[in-house]
């Protein structure tokens, strides 16, 4: 009888743990936002940073990762000089964590049609 109770208790515990681990309430949100530099962005003026505008919240998801999926080198240069990535080689990425709220327009120096904006809110 004790073995049967132990088995039932283990099954109940396993069911609860599976439910909790898959519940959105208990999942942590991402602390970063991805911006893609797509293939062809260096030669095709209709392509650029994807998405071109991102919104982040300080202390929640205030890190932006720019990923260069193009075969050309790119940079991420704040229009106001707040941040600058240097050249990002193909297949690499650059990360910046925003600590002040505001609107941050940026561009790619070698490819002036590539522009974007990061909007940073505080909690």
Where are these regions (language model features)?
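Extracytoplasmic copper-binding redox domains, predominantly the cupredoxin/blue-copper superfamily
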Residues: 1-123
């Amino acid at each position: 009888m004790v073995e049967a109770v132990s088995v039932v208790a283990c099954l109940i515990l396993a069911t609860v743990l599976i439910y909790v681990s898959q519940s959105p309430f208990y999942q942590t949100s991402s602390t970063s936002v991805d911006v893609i530099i797509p293939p062809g962005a260096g030669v095709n003026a209709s392509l650029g940073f994807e998405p071109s505008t991102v919104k982040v919240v300080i202390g929640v998801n205030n890190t932006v990762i720019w990923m260069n999926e193009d075969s050309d080198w790119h940079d991420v240069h704040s229009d106001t000089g707040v941040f600058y990535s240097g050249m990002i080689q193909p297949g690499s990425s650059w990360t910046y964590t925003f600590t002040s709220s505001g609107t941050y327009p940026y561009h790619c120096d070698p490819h002036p049609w590539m522009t974007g904006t990061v909007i940073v809110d505080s909690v």
